[in-house]
Amino acid sequence: MKTTSSPAALALAEAAPMSNVRWRIFLILLLLTAINYIDRASLSVALPLIAPEFNLTPAMEGLMLSAFFWSYALMQIPGGLLLDRFHTRGIIGAATIAWGAFQALGAASHNWLVLLFTRIGLGVAESPIMPAGAKLNGSWLTPNERGRGAVLVDGGAPLGSALGAILISALIAWLGSWRLAFVIAGVGTILAGVLAWKYIRNHPSEHPGVNEAELRHITEGNASAHAAAAKASIPLRVLLKDRSIFAMFAGYSCILAVFYGLLTWMPSYLHKEHGLDISAMGGATFLIFMCGFVGELIGGWIGDRWRASGASPNLVMRVMFSGSSLVAAACILGAAYVGNTGAVITLLCVAMFFIRWCGMYWCLPAIIGGPSRTGVLGGTMNFCGNMAGVLVPIIIGLIVQFTGAYFFALIFFVAAAVLIAVFSSLIDYRERTF
């Protein structure tokens, strides 16, 4: 714990400007999450080259693409339990280095089974990152900063989705090999893992770059959280009686149902329904997801500023989540009826801008579970969300197959966005004092 040894030293420390180590840590987490999504996208981009090389049937291609998501989803709860038991810093560093290794090892695949194994390993290794972000959100940020912290961690999803296809395809075109592209992506991920391990600390008091002003800002802002941490670990049976937990799981499932549904099916929708070629489709997809990234940052800033003004957490969060999801629902509904391609892309940009405000869901595990249960709650929330993310692309495929159009697929997304508003209104966003 940092201390000052004399009144003069204390006065000097108080006069010094506050360091900003906490925000550098969350920028690193943004980088890790973006890399997370770039590495996920690598197989999708390289599949047209990999499929003929390994003689993959369409069914085998689907298996290959889904392998990551199944292992990623199934490891969310175990990953959260590990974070509650062991040091967050070490798990982040080890997980990032491991997923970089699996990404690079994919280049050595001599048949589809080996490549499948590397994708399963990639999902396992990436699984602790989002719950780890929720854990650090609770220990490094004050209640009035957690919205921005949550959207920095979650903002890597739209940012990585926007950049992934462009970067991986550019590497393949430049190097003339999907294998070399996988190696470079893997090595870059490993270097990011080393950076994260060297800079991140579990608690502000452990970081050499945190000065007295920043440490005092964090500890005083989290006085109630520290008081809760001093108590015994909250029994899970107590948490399971809290309606907010199940509403949080359901709400986040609907968020990822919309996001993953658009992520997987929007390019095909723009190509088949609106006639965009591959180049135009890529540009539109990049624009839509970049709007999501910008929206996520702006939403977190608005939420924190509103909280800092003295507004109650329930008012801020319910209005932010419900309002943004209903605006997104209205835009997607409009896209279902509008025929003009430019108008459709604009509506989807606005929808993605607002739906990503819900990235602030990642501050909820620390609020509801307290320091002792943030990891397992964050892992369970991400498990529920990613199971929806696994199932929704299949559901949308069946809808399109049986109806022959994308209209009812868009209506499905509208319904999911409305349900985000419903479930978000059922959550109590006040700090828990068990």
Regions found by a protein language model. Name each.
Residues 43-44, 240-299, 358, 362:
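Extracytoplasmic gate region of multi-pass secondary transporters
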Residues 55, 87, 102, 108-114, ...:
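Helix-breaking motifs and short loop linkers at transmembrane-helix boundaries and internal kinks
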Residues 366-405:
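A late C-terminal transmembrane helix in Major Facilitator Superfamily
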Residues 118-158:
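Cytoplasmic helix-loop-helix junction between adjacent transmembrane helices
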Residues 153, 157-207:
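Helix-loop-helix hairpin linking two adjacent transmembrane segments in secondary transporters
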Residues 90-104, 314-333:
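Structural signature of the two symmetry-related core transmembrane helices
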Residues 74-113:
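Conserved MFS/SLC helix-loop-helix module at the cytosolic interface between two early adjacent transmembrane helices
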Residues 148-166, 173, 292, 296, ...:
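Glycine-rich segments within core transmembrane alpha-helices of 12-TM secondary carriers
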